[in-house]
Amino acid sequence: AQSKNFIEDKEAGLVSEVAQGGTNFSGGQRQRLAIARALANDPKILISDESTSALDPKTTKQILALLQDLNQKLGLTIVLITHEMQIVKDIANRVAVMQDGRLIEEGSVLEIFSDPKQPLTQDFISTATGIDEAMVKIEKQEIVEHLSENSILVQLKYAGASTDEPLLNELYKHYQVTANILYGNIEILDGTPVGELVVVLSGEKAALAGAQEAIRQAGVQLKVLKGGQ
């Protein structure tokens, strides 16, 4: 009954078209009708297989909003099969990554996007965040091409409470290490802020070592991309 009421609310505009055979349905209308039909028997799980792959961005958002309504208002579990990582970020709570028919990694959206373990997952995440494209441009910058002996190029990843800390200011205050931000990105994933920076850190060798340790102690992932030999 709950699903029936939901269908009536969401699909009222489609009723007349269904009566006429639905010959003029758009891609988005077809997807909404397919969802309505799937709800007819009050299922506990709804499987959505690449349901937005052929839709324009506006219609994609509408379909995702409909699926979120189903999840939140009906308590319906939705298994969303997709290759579009932006959709995963927008709607999912948990993620399972498949390769050659095998499950290779699973976890919360926050876990997968902030700390992917498998190479395939890492490739997906790098593409979704735009870091690969950004790195091509960063590596061509003069400050990186001619990195000084007292500097290192690092990638920082942080999530949750660590995004609230004025970390780079603290590095200068305690270690006299300066930070030149070359790239930055922050997103909200499942209600949690997740950020990524590419930074040139400059200072004395011992100070740089101390700064790196302080960054890790603050719960921030650090990867040295260049320098520090």
Task: Please provide the spans of the model-predicted regions.
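Conserved "ABC signature" C-loop
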Residues: 1-20
